[in-house]
Amino acid sequence: EVGSLSSVNELRSLIQLSALNFFVLNEEEIIGFIICFREGSEYHSPNYKFFSDCEDKFLYIDRVVIKKEYRRMGAGTSLYEHLSKVANLENLPICCEVNTNPINQISLNFHSKNKYIKVGQGYFDDHSVAYLKRK
């Protein structure tokens, strides 16, 4: 599951446009990754735009992917801990969105546990999201 991406080329383009991306390994296997953008990017996501309109400097999480059989085993926490260290170097808030319709309760719980607070709501034709931020 990589959100609304339709091809490997689209993922490659997203990575090239991103400001920060890294992955987590289990031995030699990539089991997860995160893709992030900074302010001022050419990225045209409406969710990214929400934060662009209200934050001067920020780190936006666009994608987090953990291979299904490795979920709830600490891989996501590891990615977020590393991301927090990077953000702290420049005192950047970390921003993201989580689906609220259909609800992604696991992700909402994860972000709440990691001190993300709701700063807005986005409504779209086929879904809605909560905008979250961690200082």
What role is predicted for each listed range?
Residues 121-135:
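C-terminal "cap" of GNAT-fold acetyltransferases
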